[in-house]
Amino acid sequence: MSQLRWWVVSQLLLLIVVCILDHSEGARVCPKIVPGLDKLRVGVDITKLDLLPLFDLGDNGFRSAVADYTCDRGQTTVVDGESFDVPDQVDSVVIESSGQQTSSVTTIKSESQISQALSISAGISVDTAKAGFSSSASYAEMQEAITKYGRTVSQMSAVYTTCSANLSPNLLLGQNPLQTLSRLPSDFTADTEGYYDFIKTYGTHYFNKGKLGGMFLFTSETDMSYFQNKNSQQVEANIKATFASILSTETGGSSDQSKEVIEFKESSLITAKFFGGRTNLAADGLTKWQPTIAKLPYFMSGTLSTISSLIADTTKRASMELAVKNYLLKAKVANLDRLTYIRLNSWTVGHNELRDLSAQLQNLKKKTIFSDEDEKLLQSIEDQVSVPAWFSDRTTFCFRSTAVGSADQCNGQSTSTLCAEPNRYTQQYMDKTYLGDTGCRLVWKLSTTESSDWFKSVKVNFRWYPTWSPCACGPVGTPFTISAPANSWTQDYLDVTNPKFGECMLQWMIEVPPTATLWAKNLEFCIDFTCGKKKQCVDANHWTEPYLDISAHEACGMSWALIAK
């Protein structure tokens, strides 16, 4: 009975296709479409989408057409003095001639922020973004820059919009994808390869809205050391100045030779690219390049819809949605496999566990359909090797000093609190206890607004002992240790080191419990002190080398950092 039902359904589908083909034969073909609108009717593989690629070579994620354009209505519009056809399937077209619009600075400090940043221009939801872009060349480049080399990626652009368009909400699948779909069974599990071939040909999504024009894109990968002793406003101002300098240089203008721009360039790997128009004319100036954009526009951004939403057959639509879900999971496996390989070559703790995870990923690579247990396994692997957003975006390491007497001894303030996100040093605390005898009370804290349960057992540890005088910080040679769990300040340490009271040895450690995930066990704690040019990083659960706090006759700059590798 089921075979008979399937035969009847398949014949009906073929009849529908034939009817559509017969109808389309009489449709007026669009002889000259508005430049750039072809991109709105093609499919997109969300896992490989690379709208603004850092490299010219590679797959940009665009696929074959999912809709057919016809021009029965005869609608036209003028672009740069020339008439062009507006397809019936395009709901609205707005021809623009805006001047340069400069974007704000986008900063990507963690892997969790890569998809989020790339999704902004593509106009997709956060849930889809988690699996999106991970197979693109730009994603892989940013991932390596952040996770392998500890760099921060920043982007900024100058945009010249020439056209924006929306597809009709009543868009229908085109002849070719409809024919391909008609040959597929209603059940995804009956022909998984057939459904995957459809996705490989037509993609997972299409743009129902788009913005076209020209763009100059600036991307920098900046060493962590650059951000030391600079606040976010200073960093952003320097990025903007460097962007403006490079845009000026690329378009035949002069270069900014200020020390801020030079310093940023020396600390960064910079990529600058033009999109749209005759890019070979850009070096002759914006006045040469900009007029060529309207007829040679680039698809800069848009809003995505799923191709499955165009499938009229509810059963096949559900099967296509299931196929896309599994296709995205396959991309997630590939991404985690790449990330695990990076971890094996950069982490110092947990190599045996990483090899086990890698073996599990090799088995998952063979899957065509993922079970609920497979999804749980994937999530558990991700939890081990990927630094979560709650840590990279919402966690801080803080230091606070409180003057007991004169504020001159303690950073020049009665109370000073200095905090930094992971992979950033705190701003310098200037230790000047040699200026008095009352000293400064010092405390440290690791804070987060959300976390896994095990993180509550992570501790900040600090210990000290005097070298020759018990007046400085207690009995000579006897170490004192204070510690505090996450979201709590340590007890006060009274710093009265000076030539009168003596010197103290200081050490710090981040203590991570055995129940923690692998990424946390590979955290590093770093110190950078100007006195003695003391700069070092140690793994979690290890003390820093002793630092001799002399506080004799000069101020000592002190900074701390928590590094997620």
Curated annotation (Swiss-Prot):
Keywords recorded for this protein, A-Z: Disulfide bond, Enterotoxin, Glycoprotein, Hemagglutinin, Lipoprotein, Membrane, Neurotoxin, Secreted, Signal, Storage protein, Target cell membrane, Target membrane, Toxin
GO CC entries: extracellular region; membrane; other organism cell membrane
Tissue spec: Produced by albumen secretory cells. Found in developing eggs.
Domain (MACPF): residue spans on this chain: 27-340
The keyword DNA-binding belongs to this UniProt entry's keyword annotation: no
Subcellular localization(s) per the UniProt record: Secreted; Target cell membrane
Signal peptide feature range: 1-26
PTM per Swiss-Prot/TrEMBL: Glycosylated. Contains four O-linked and one N-linked oligosaccharide bonds. The protein contains 2.5% of carbohydrates (high levels of mannose, galactose, and NAcGlucosamine, and small amounts of NacGalactosamine).
InterPro entries, per database record: MACPF (IPR020864), MACPF_CS (IPR020863), Perforin-1_pore-forming (IPR052784)
Any Gene Ontology biological process: defense response to virus
Subunit description: Perivitellin-2 is a heterooctamer of 4 identical 98 kDa heterodimers, each composed of one 31 kDa and one 67 kDa subunits. The 98 kDa heterodimer subunits are held together by disulfide bridges while the heterodimers are assembled into the native perivitellin-2 octamer by non-covalent forces.
Primary role: The egg defensive protein perivitellin-2 is a pore-forming two-subunit glycoprotein that affects both the nervous and digestive systems of mammals. In addition, it is a source of both structural and energetic molecules during embryonic development. The tachylectin subunit (31 kDa) binds target membranes while the MACPF subunit (67 kDa) disrupts lipid bilayers forming large pores altering the plasma membrance conductance. Both in vivo and in vitro, the protein shows wide pH range stability and is resistant to enzymatic proteolysis from gastrointestinal environments.
Name of the featured protein: Perivitellin-2 67 kDa subunit
Species the sequence originates in: Pomacea canaliculata (Golden apple snail)
